[in-house]
Swiss-Prot record:
Disulfide pairings: 38-60, 46-65, 50-67
Domain of life: Eukaryota
InterPro entries: LCN-type_CS_alpha_beta_dom (IPR044062), Scorpion_toxin-like_sf (IPR036574), Scorpion_toxinL/defensin (IPR002061)
Biological classification of the source: Eukaryota, Metazoa, Ecdysozoa, Arthropoda, Chelicerata
LCN-type CS-alpha/beta domain segment(s): 24-85
UniProt KW keywords: Disulfide bond, Neurotoxin, Secreted, Signal, Toxin
Domain free text: Has the structural arrangement of an alpha-helix connected to antiparallel beta-sheets by disulfide bonds (CS-alpha/beta).
Name of one Pfam family that matches: Toxin_3
Subcellular location: Secreted
UniProt protein name: Neurtoxin 10
Coiled coil location: none
A GO term for molecular function: toxin activity
Tissue: Expressed by the venom gland.
Length: 85
């Protein structure tokens, strides 16, 4: 019974974006360490932002751009720029 509750909480937390499971639902950050927000007035194209960070694809999740298979080292914008210099 306790195991089922623990697994259920883990699934809910991963779906809500509280924790990251195997690189899924990772939020990229801009040069000022802020998240890319979406779902308000001017929506950034999350897929383009995530591809700039080296992820496969991106989407809007809980008003923040979320990337699929985003490498941890590319989560910050400046680390991506530094790699290309």
């Amino acid at each position: 019974m306790k195991f089922c509750v623990a697994v259920s909480l883990l699934i809910i937390a991963s779906m809500a974006g509280v924790i990251s499971v195997s690189g899924y639902d990772v939020y990229p950050r801009d040069y000022a360490e802020n998240y890319y927000y979406c779902g308000v007035r001017k929506d950034p194209d999350c897929s383009k932002i995530c591809k700039l960070h080296g992820a496969r694809v991106g989407y809007c999740h809980v008003k923040r751009c979320s990337c699929v298979d985003l490498p941890e080292k590319n989560q910050n914008f400046l680390s991506v720029i530094w790699k290309h210099c």
